[in-house]
Structures are given as C-alpha cells and as structure tokens.
C-alpha cells in the first residue's frame, strides 16, 4: 500500500461502510445510500494541541458529512480531513 502522510492538522480516515440492506432485506445501490459519517483513523498529521484533539491511528470517529477530500488508494476509498471537522470519537 502507498503510504500517505497528511500535512498540517489533517487526518487520513477510512470510511466505515454501512449495511447495504434495509431491515426488510432490500439491497440499496450505492447511489441511494448516504455518505458514511463514521471512519477509522489511518494516519495523523502534526496536531498542535494534542490535548484538545486526542486522536490516534485506529480510533473510530464521526465527521462532518461534506468535509474533507475523497481519495482512492489501491482501490480503497479514503478521506483527508481537517482535524476540526472531526465531531466525536467513538469509544467501544
């Protein structure tokens, strides 16, 4: 895999794909699904205030719906996003 290192206060995240079926068993085409807003952090740039943004590789996050720049790496979808567009960290 090509290594992508985000510059500045940015993250490289991989969207977590949602279920492609409805509760009734109907399979939804990609065009009918909403853009995912959950992702796993793949790489972290240089964060100035690490106490304010405690985000590490492997964390799962919720991000603003239309934030970031979508890119493809080895046929996988990723987003480069500003750390300020991260709304929450998911703890399981």
UniProtKB/Swiss-Prot annotation:
GO biological process: chaperone cofactor-dependent protein refolding
An annotated Gene Ontology molecular function: protein-folding chaperone binding
Keywords, alphabetical: Chaperone, Cytoplasm
Pfam families, per the entry: Cpn10 (PF00166)
Superkingdom of the source species: Bacteria
GO cellular component annotations of the record: cytoplasm
Subcellular location: Cytoplasm
SUPFAM superfamilies linked to this entry: GroES-like (SSF50129)
Oligomer status and interactors: Heptamer of 7 subunits arranged in a ring. Interacts with the chaperonin GroEL.
Function: Together with the chaperonin GroEL, plays an essential role in assisting protein folding. The GroEL-GroES system forms a nano-cage that allows encapsulation of the non-native substrate proteins and provides a physical environment optimized to promote and accelerate protein folding. GroES binds to the apical surface of the GroEL ring, thereby capping the opening of the GroEL channel.
Protein family (similarity comment): Belongs to the GroES chaperonin family.
Protein name per UniProt: Co-chaperonin GroES
Organism: Thermotoga neapolitana
């Amino acid at each position: 895999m090509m290594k992508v290192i985000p510059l500045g206060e940015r993250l490289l995240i991989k969207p977590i794909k949602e279920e492609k079926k409805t509760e009734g068993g109907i399979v939804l085409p990609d065009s009918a699904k909403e853009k995912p807003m959950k992702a796993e952090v793949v790489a972290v740039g240089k964060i100035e205030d690490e106490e304010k943004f405690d985000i590490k590789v492997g964390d799962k996050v919720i991000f603003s719906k239309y934030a970031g720049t979508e890119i493809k790496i080895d046929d996988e979808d990723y987003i480069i996003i500003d750390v300020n567009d991260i709304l929450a960290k998911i703890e399981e």
